[in-house]
């Protein structure tokens, strides 16, 4: 199931940023690799985005993937 939110900030140089979910839950980490997999060049601050919340197999942390702008 897709979640929706707003890009809080994204730094392409650092390769990551955060999405503020519309449901008021904790901010979601987003890595540049997820942006590239989605075929997007960048995320803009304040941009609306749909995403899936996935758990990283290595770190166990949650992040956004399958992004749709």
Swiss-Prot record:
Residues 5-65 form the CSD domain. InterPro entries: Cold_shock_CspA, Cold_shock_domain, CSD, CSD_CS, CSP_DNA-bd, NA-bd_OB-fold. Its main location: cytoplasm. This is Probable cold shock protein y4cH. CDD domains: CSP_CDS. It is found in: Cytoplasm. Keywords: Activator, Cytoplasm, DNA-binding, Plasmid, Transcription, Transcription regulation. It holds the Pfam family CSD. GO terms for cellular component: cytosol. GO terms for molecular function: DNA binding. Signal peptide: none annotated.
């Amino acid at each position: 199931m897709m979640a929706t939110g707003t890009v809080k900030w994204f730094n392409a140089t650092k390769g990551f940023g955060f999405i503020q979910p519309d449901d008021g839950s904790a901010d979601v980490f987003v890595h540049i690799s997820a942006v590239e997999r989605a075929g997007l060049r960048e995320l803009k601050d304040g941009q609306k985005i749909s995403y899936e919340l996935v758990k990283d197999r290595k770190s166990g942390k949650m992040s956004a993937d399958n992004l749709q702008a």
